[in-house]
């Protein structure tokens, strides 16, 4: 946890023109233990997209305890914290996603999720299987560190985003709705950073690239209509199963060759 806290804090320092010497001596060790505790709590209490009510309350309460200006109810359950430095400067935003997945946890951990909810009309377990519990806890830690070190130029926006995994059918949500509701305005954001933990990256390391990264997936539906016929005259029918199989194979070829 500590390397992530340092990396995010240093990123803000660089963009906001804060000297690294001002923040490198902060007590990351003290905050690290809190971040682990927060992560365990969030992991044990996961919530699905657009339903992150308790997670939002947990985050908002922490930010308020630090004296940070807090906005709630952004894009349904999103939370935004605003921390102003002692001098004027750029506005830097940090973003973490909050929602969990409809997955039943099979780990044997003291903080494992036992939560059960409804997803697409079916009962399912709920689990932070994509690391969002860690993202939230890290950003809460960065907020605490910076709130104790306000001698920087500019403003920091802490954006806790709901519904990164996709809104429920028929609902708006996620980053798109947050932007629509003005999360990048008042004050206008000059730069924004997001992170995602990765088991393939060594502890203490970060990876980055120019241009797009952490792209979202999209969903679409293909309806295939067949034509019924008697079993003795299959040539008079249109078999939707065979057609579906061909389409699936063709789409998979696109993915593997691009």
Regions found by a protein language model. Give the residues of each.
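Bacterial Sec-dependent N-terminal signal peptides
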Residues: 1-23
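Generic marker of residues within folded, mature protein domains
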Residues: 2, 11-13, 71, 84, ...
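Hydrophobic alpha-helical segments, especially transmembrane helices
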Residues: 3, 7-8, 40, 133-136, ...
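Intrinsic-disorder/low-complexity regions
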Residues: 3-6, 24-26, 98, 148, ...
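Alpha-helical transmembrane segments and their juxtamembrane interfaces
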Residues: 16-17, 142, 240
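Acidic/His- and Gly-rich active-site-bordering loop/insert found
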Residues: 22-127, 137-153
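Histidine/acidic-residue-rich, glycine-tolerant segments that coordinate divalent metal ions
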Residues: 115-127, 133-134, 145, 152-258
